[in-house]
């Protein structure tokens, strides 16, 4: 016989077989039940075996699933949905927060409008997407597309397998690549292991520094060697195919710098940099 419980929404049917029973009460010394249980389950929704639905307008249709909050759905087996308008649609998935979706097997979505669709993926923050298997997206509007990739910050995209993108609007498009800074130029040919972007926005991209897989660095500006980041000691400059070396004076407390050049005869000259 169906049993009912009074809630704020009126009388709700409890789809459960609870034993042992004493009248209409569970035995406090042995509160064991089998079957499904609901308080606030969405009317007409599918009831999963051994599922539990509570809150308002919730659906626990997966076997052994649990849903709570408002308008949440746990349709995957052993899934869990909580919060508001969240969906855990795959087996062993977990969705929490607001308007989040965990559609990958064993995935976890939390925050606001996040999507964890890769198997064992994790999406958190606001409007993030973890579509690669074992991927992780966090921050705001980030995308972890490659398997085992990680995207964090703001509008970053980790497209390559095992890639990592961080900062603002960066793209790590190749396997095992790392991109940081802001708005770098995407490298789809896997030339670089490391990229530091210094672009202006999503439409105006540029790089400050790259490092290729042979360990060869490139710098947009003049690299600094020695001294400190504040005093900018000696410098090495490569521009227009010519090589110049700028060295700080070795005299104590001197602030002078000299440009060292070598001509075709091998003669070396030093000119003070004003």
Where in this protein do the model-derived segments appear?
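Periodic small-residue-enriched repeat registers in elongated scaffold domains
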Residues: 2, 16-225, 229-231
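Extended, folded domain segments that form the structural surfaces/walls around functional sites
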Residues: 229-240
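Extracellular repetitive beta-rich solenoid segments
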Residues: 7, 189-192, 198-217, 221, ...
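Short, solvent-exposed loop/turn motifs
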Residues: 11-13, 229, 257
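Amphipathic alpha-helical oligomerization/assembly segments
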Residues: 10, 18, 22-25, 244-246, ...
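Short, intrinsically disordered N-terminal pre-domain segments
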Residues: 1-16, 274
